[in-house]
Amino acid sequence: MSSGKIAQVIGPVVDVLFAAGEKLPEINNALVVYKNDERKTKIVLEVALELGDGMVRTIAMESTDGLTRGMEVLDTGRPISVPVGKETLGRVFNVLGDTIDLEAPFTEDAERQPIHKKAPTFDELSTSSEILETGIKVIDLLAPYLKGGKVGLFGGAGVGKTVLIQELIHNIAQEHGGISVFTGVGERTREGNDLYWEMKESGVIEKTAMVFGQMNEPPGARMRVALTGLTIAEYFRDVEGQDVLLFIDNIFRFTQAGSEVSALLGRMPSAVGYQPTLATEMGQLQERITSTKKGSVTSIQAIYVPADDYTDPAPATAFAHLDSTTNLERKLVQLGIYPAVDPLASSSRALAPEIVGEEHYAVAAEVKRVLQRYHELQDIIAILGMDELSDEEKTLVARARRIQFFLSQNFNVAEQFTGQPGSYVPVAETVRGFKEILDGKYDHLPEDAFRGVGSIEDVIAKAEKMGF
């Protein structure tokens, strides 16, 4: 194990000098600095650049407080390695694979795997197309998720990305019994803490491994924590042959941390100040998230859109890798429609007759047509009023409003805020409900009966309570 000495510390960047004759560490190797002689507390550094003359530049995974020039640095000879396997379920980790849930730490002989790996080869990939039922009407009907696909949840600040992710974890664990890996990348510690306790209360935690690199942590940790979560998910896919759900909240913070690291390493910035290696870094992460012949990793990634600008390089680069996009719209939040999924902007490769079936495809297409026409008529209504519309258009507007409200539903994970029980709606029920609304079967029911309910039976029950 070769050793060097700290030459300089600039925030999270640490330069290490290896003496002549010492073997230089490879790029991405983990180096360790012990803060005191007892060797109880250590700081892990990851090699980022070789500067020449025995000097390497590293990025710290923890705060560099207390580091001084001349301290000894040891090369571990391998990348950061994290625990994998069934023992990780129900536990909470940091970027280094250390437990942070105040329960017993993992032993040294626990199975570990390096976080840097190659993506599966072409002949290992699976090509089947199967729908993953989420129980959320707007998603299942208009932008269904593929098993083993990549889904992006797009939206600005405060439109409900994290709540939607929590509901997906809840539904998939309760209805499908699947394993989930939740990776918190650069988000609020409070949200991570709330999620942990909610999952513990609902019993979902037993099927979930959680990895966090939160907002207050150095950029190195925020940049690598997504790889830590992915490594745990890959083990369940490749060794256990499982179908795994990988949640990343928020993939924008991964890019943001990469931008910070790039600037600290002295690279010339690219468009909008992002790192020149943006597309490469995103590709290296996304190409590992895939389905193989052994199992699948379905990833659901929350993507913060800076200032609601979809042309920003960070969300635009993520777009290229996705099978489905779920766009959250602030205007729907203002109308009180939750989840605030934009039915016209959201899309999915899976919405094809050969995958979802002819009836589902036809109903989804008609729902989109009605909503699009309503969207076009809104200007006329705003200027001239409803009276200027033809009878046919008035009927279409009435149905479109019912559809818009019926696309909302109460979530199980939001019950404590709304006071309303959540609902899980199977795909067949969803398709039937919308087909009957389009056929005019419920034109006599009030619009409010369609808001925040589950199946069409719930609409009828709500209308009866209202006296209809």
Curated annotation (Swiss-Prot):
EC number assigned by the record: 7.1.2.2
Q: Name one GO cellular component term.
A: plasma membrane
- Give the coiled coil ranges: none
The protein's matches in PROSITE patterns, at most eight in alphabetical order, are given as: ATPASE_ALPHA_BETA
Specify the domain of life of the species encoding this protein: Bacteria
How does this chain sit within the bilayer? Peripheral membrane protein
Which EC class heads this enzyme's classification?
Answer: translocase
Where is it localised? Cell membrane
Which sequence ranges are marked TM in the entry? none
Q: Which reaction does it catalyse?
A: ATP + H2O + 4 H(+)(in) = ADP + phosphate + 5 H(+)(out)
Q: Which SMART domains does this one have? A: AAA
GO molecular-function term, one example from the UniProt record: proton-transporting ATP synthase activity, rotational mechanism
Q: Does the keyword Nucleotide-binding apply?
A: yes
Give a single Pfam family match.
ATP-synt_ab_N
The record's listing under SUPFAM superfamilies reads: C-terminal domain of alpha and beta subunits of F1 ATP synthase, N-terminal domain of alpha and beta subunits of F1 ATP synthase, P-loop containing nucleoside triphosphate hydrolases
Keyword terms of this UniProt record: ATP synthesis, ATP-binding, Cell membrane, CF(1), Hydrogen ion transport, Ion transport, Membrane, Nucleotide-binding, Translocase, Transport
Q: Which PANTHER family match?
A: ATP SYNTHASE, ATP SYNTHASE SUBUNIT BETA, MITOCHONDRIAL
Name the family: Belongs to the ATPase alpha/beta chains family.
Quaternary structure (record): F-type ATPases have 2 components, CF(1) - the catalytic core - and CF(0) - the membrane proton channel. CF(1) has five subunits: alpha(3), beta(3), gamma(1), delta(1), epsilon(1). CF(0) has three main subunits: a(1), b(2) and c(9-12). The alpha and beta chains form an alternating ring which encloses part of the gamma chain. CF(1) is attached to CF(0) by a central stalk formed by the gamma and epsilon chains, while a peripheral stalk is formed by the delta and b chains.
Q: What does this protein do?
A: Produces ATP from ADP in the presence of a proton gradient across the membrane. The catalytic sites are hosted primarily by the beta subunits.
Quote the protein name from its UniProt record: ATP synthase subunit beta
Species classification: Bacteria, Bacillati, Bacillota, Bacilli, Lactobacillales
